[in-house]
Amino acid sequence: MLSWRLQTGPEKAELQELNARLYDYVCRVRELERENLLLEEELRGRRGREGLWAEGQARCAEEARSLRQQLDELSWATALAEGERDALRRELRELQRLDAEERAARGRLDAELGAQQRELQEALGARAALEALLGRLQAERRGLDAAHERDVRELRARAASLTMHFRARATGPAAPPPRLREVHDSYALLVAESWRETVQLYEDEVRELEEALRRGQESRLQAEEETRLCAQEAEALRREALGLEQLRARLEDALLRMREEYGIQAEERQRVIDCLEDEKATLTLAMADWLRDYQDLLQVKTGLSLEVATYRALLEGESNPEIVIWAEHVENMPSEFRNKSYHYTDSLLQRENERNLFSRQKAPLASFNHSSALYSNLSGHRGSQTGTSIGGDARRGFLGSGYSSSATTQQENSYGKAVSSQTNVRTFSPTYGLLRNTEAQVKTFPDRPKAGDTREVPVYIGEDSTIARESYRDRRDKVAAGASESTRSNERTVILGKKTEVKATREQERNRPETIRTKPEEKMFDSKEKASEERNLRWEELTKLDKEARQRESQQMKEKAKEKDSPKEKSVREREVPISLEVSQDRRAEVSPKGLQTPVKDAGGGTGREAEARELRFRLGTSDATGSLQGDSMTETVAENIVTSILKQFTQSPETEASADSFPDTKVTYVDRKELPGERKTKTEIVVESKLTEDVDVSDEAGLDYLLSKDIKEVGLKGKSAEQMIGDIINLGLKGREGRAKVVNVEIVEEPVSYVSGEKPEEFSVPFKVEEVEDVSPGPWGLVKEEEGYGESDVTFSVNQHRRTKQPQENTTHVEEVTEAGDSEGEQSYFVSTPDEHPGGHDRDDGSVYGQIHIEEESTIRYSWQDEIVQGTRRRTQKDGAVGEKVVKPLDVPAPSLEGDLGSTHWKEQARSGEFHAEPTVIEKEIKIPHEFHTSMKGISSKEPRQQLVEVIGQLEETLPERMREELSALTREGQGGPGSVSVDVKKVQGAGGSSVTLVAEVNVSQTVDADRLDLEELSKDEASEMEKAVESVVRESLSRQRSPAPGSPDEEGGAEAPAAGIRFRRWATRELYIPSGESEVAGGASHSSGQRTPQGPVSATVEVSSPTGFAQSQVLEDVSQAARHIKLGPSEVWRTERMSYEGPTAEVVEVSAGGDLSQAASPTGASRSVRHVTLGPGQSPLSREVIFLGPAPACPEAWGSPEPGPAESSADMDGSGRHSTFGCRQFHAEKEIIFQGPISAAGKVGDYFATEESVGTQTSVRQLQLGPKEGFSGQIQFTAPLSDKVELGVIGDSVHMEGLPGSSTSIRHISIGPQRHQTTQQIVYHGLVPQLGESGDSESTVHGEGSADVHQATHSHTSGRQTVMTEKSTFQSVVSESPQEDSAEDTSGAEMTSGVSRSFRHIRLGPTETETSEHIAIRGPVSRTFVLAGSADSPELGKLADSSRTLRHIAPGPKETSFTFQMDVSNVEAIRSRTQEAGALGVSDRGSWRDADSRNDQAVGVSFKASAGEGDQAHREQGKEQAMFDKKVQLQRMVDQRSVISDEKKVALLYLDNEEEENDGHWF
């Protein structure tokens, strides 16, 4: 029991433990299941979210697509709306125009109506007056009638009373007394007469009034009618306008409908097109598969047929003992007998071969009978001079199709079929050419019918167009080696020659080649079906080259390209037909032809191919283990010709096969042949090229017409009278072509022909001269190049579209090329090559020197000179382009290019040594002249360089325009040119080593055209001669007053003449390079403009002035004499230049100063100026000062320059006007300044802006043009002297303020430039003793001016952005008589004008860099009248003292508007690119207003200029101080953006007169 308990106790514990573990496991499993459920829920949720995100993405994409579609629709709708808007705008403009017209018409009618109404009112008033007069007259008449009646009654009463009284007294009636009766009667008559007259008068007046009334009524009715008609017309016009509006609406609706319909149609057609494209692609794939299968089958079939046919032909040819026997027999036969008897032998052998073959039912050899063994041996070597190929004599009959003369289509297609199956046999009757003046006899053997066979075999021979028989030995030595090709562009090679008899000897053949004319052979086909069938078969055979053959062909083409002897040889298009020959004979024969190596000239077509004539080596090797039988080369040639006849079928292009009238001659020439040895067999690869050749006799015009009517690529001319033939061909080719542009390229190059074999001694030809006939007119394109070797002239005509480049030959030749052309279709070239003496050890890479004058029609000439000694020099010529210059530079010669107005070329030539040191540079300039110009090139190349230019250009002067004649006039005279001319000094300089010769052409240019000063030229064109006289007088006067000699002659002109006694003017040409040796790259980069090369240095005209007191050098541009001096300081390349020029009232001067940057300067008219240009160190950082003074008359200014480098200041007792323009690396600044003195109405135009001022007094126009990345046109300042009450100043800027004051002129101007818009300009003018207060304020400037009688204070505050950058306070402590001041700062700057004693304190803060500049300027001296304009200059400060009363300080602002910053260090000076450069300084005064008496005023100027150093935008610290005493200083410096200059040439002219001046006694002017 106990034991059981003991035993069961542990088991129970184990079971409990197991249960506990099981419970834990189950709990763990349940937890994991819950976790799995949670994870699955989360995964499902995430998948749902991903699905939602994908749906959202799809929704977004769909929305984007819909939005894009909406955008497209909206764009279309916008375009439609814009179109409708434009239509409505046009309609509105039309309606407005019509409305204006109607209003004008209505206004005219209203005016007429008013006039009529006024006339009506006047008529009515006159009528009323007349009615009133009528009433008065009637009343008067009634009164008169009443008085008359009363008087009558009274008289009657009195009479009655008297009668009664008498009757009463007397017994009877008594008669009145006679006196009373007379009175009564007379009174009655008088009254009756007056009454009648009165009544008549009244009736006339009434009649006139009625007539006037009637006229008035008629005019009123007419006016009413006209009014009614005008109303009707206006209504009709309104109706018409309404109808047009409705019509326009209908048309627009119709347009919209048509657009929709067309859109629908276009969509439908696009769908149809897409369907057709799909169908086409499917058909293309199907056709490609079919053609690929068919090609594979054809390749297999062709390979088998070709191999079998070749083997059979070779075996038959070698197994026929008659060939070997005949070959041995014919070697011992005389040449003449053999030539006459070979026809019958060939025919007999041909028939026997055919009989043997037919009996054995093999492929007939007759299919290759045109290259049978006998005929090939006899005729294969003939005509090697003209490039006849082996065995190609009898192939002319079937040139186009390449068929055998007696083979049928079935035979060619199936090489090995039985003859009995050939029932459809066609015979070919070729037409043979006429062989003139040759001993060759052409026989056509009649066809002989054979028993049991229906075929007719016409055997014909002698169609070879170049039968030039030689002796047998010569034929063995000279296997035909002509390489030519019949290309798809129908290239022809026509052999031209004289009619000479052909002898059998080799020397006679070479010296007297024959001419044979061959007509094109005609082919006759039985039916069109068979013709097309033959073409198809030919095409099938042409497509039988497999991929391996094409790969081998490309590989061999590459290898041959490497093996070319000279760069002039290019390979023609070739076809390689791989042929595997397995011959069981151990015979290795080698034929090494040594024919004439005739280089075939470039055909020059669009493909640019060159034919290549090389020495050909033919090798037909067979290797077998059997015997070692040695045969001669004739038997080898049999096999060669058999293979050639087979390969001939593959060398025809489909175009030539399809043509019915094909070329008469096809030559198949072996180009390369390789033997690839293999196991038990040898593969022979033969590369074949073919060419069509036709011989035409050009001795008569019929043959020449035939030649010129064909599309000929290359013409070879044989004969000694080659140059005569050229003229005939050109003249004949020009008949009937006068209406078109004609160009004939004639290139005649005579040079020895080199022989590869080297067996014969070299002969050299003599220099050859060709003189062109005077009346030869330009003709069609052709190129004649003549080569002479061993007394043989071979002139090749080539119709080309490109200029020929002379390739290196055996000897260095100098070629003069004269090109003449009509329109831009082409040109006429004459290459005249004159070989040098022929040294024996020349390489092939020597070269030639080209001097070219290309004459074309549009009055320009293009002349260039080039040597091609160094390999790799390439000539590129401007063809039919714009007139200009182009520098052609080889890639491998880093020679600097020099470019003047005419161009100068420096070259070195070393011709007789193996090393070549050349720097070829070509400058070409075009001058087109009429094509009637003809020049004789005879002997030109043997003369001096100047003579060559003189002879050519001397004939051009009458046909050139006047300006071009002036430019070229210096080339035709030897003497020194005066001002305004061109002088050229062409001379040869022998090098130090003696092995090189340098030709130096120095060109003196005196006429320049600057685009920026055309207006100045127009203004002062008439006074040029007066200006020249004034300049010369000024220079002489100034030289006579110089008392101290110059420090020395300039470095640029080392070794110049010493000063001589007296003053003399001598003009000489020079070339000044202002770029130090270490700075050529920097300067080149700085002065490089896009698209053209800039010169390394300028070409300037120089006047050397020698006097006892010193030596000066003057450069002349535009007829201004100048004196120049260069001071070179120390090894650190510190140099300075000083300039002074003297001008008359209207002089023009262009100055170009090229230092580290290239600058140009132009002076205002009537100004004297002096320029000091100081450059420190190799960094070429310029320091410039500029002062410009205007005076009424020129006198003798003198300038004194400090010898040490540093900032320079200048002062003078004159008013100044200047322009200072500088450009850095990124932007350019150009100012234009025109100064007029006197009553001138002037207009100055610069760039795209135009300004005009009109006034009675002095006028000044300053134009500032900034060409930079940020700023555009900066502003224009126009200033008029206060000679009138009101001054108008117009500026092209943002805002203009003008004020007119009664006693003075005040102008306050604000100019904003660029994105920052913080440019401020103020002008405060004090006029007389009247105090004026001018105040103007805008968003960025504040000006306060206070004036009193004696003290004036002005405070200027310049605001830039959010910062005050300049504060000024100026106190004027004396009476200012008249001193207008204008302060125009393109950057922030200020100016003070003082009169008497002035004190000026200025504190300037420049931007965030806190650069401060403090100045204290004290000036003493009276002033009469001063104008001051101040603007910030670039790097240096520009100081002016006019009448010792004014000073200008220019401070460059902070980094926002850095004008020009530079770093200056003693050891390293480098330029920092600047962002903006806007500066202008202008000073104007009236004549005589600045004159000072003999008194001279002390002038002391203290300058302290500080700038904090920083990054590229912060100015480097510079401190300079200079105190100078100046009597006169005139300076002008200008830099022009190269992109704004029209002409390509950059010119530099420096004019200075440097002498340490002394005190002057009298007036200056």
UniProtKB/Swiss-Prot annotation:
UniProt region (Disordered), positions on chain: 401-421, 472-609, 1019-1060, 1080-1105, 1198-1221, 1332-1415, 1505-1525
Region (Linker 1): 50-58
One family name in Pfam for this protein: Filament
Tissues expressed in: Isoform 2 is strongly detected in adult heart, fetal skeletal muscles and fetal heart. Isoform 1 is weakly detected in fetal heart and also in fetal skeletal muscle. Isoform 1 and isoform 2 are detected in adult bladder (at protein level). The mRNA is predominantly expressed in heart and muscle with some expression in brain which may be due to tissue-specific isoforms.
Domain of life: Eukaryota
Subcellular location, record wording: Cytoplasm, Cytoskeleton; Cell junction, Adherens junction
Annotated region (Head), positions in chain: 1-10
InterPro entries: IF_conserved, IF_rod_dom, SYNM
Interaction with TLN1 and VCL: annotated span: 1152-1463
Stretches the record annotates as Coil 2: 187-300
Ranges where the record places region Coil 1A: 11-49
Record's compositionally biased regions (Polar residues): 402-421, 1087-1105, 1354-1379
GO molecular function term, any single one: structural constituent of muscle
PANTHER family per UniProt: SYNEMIN
Record protein name field: Synemin
Natural source organism: Homo sapiens
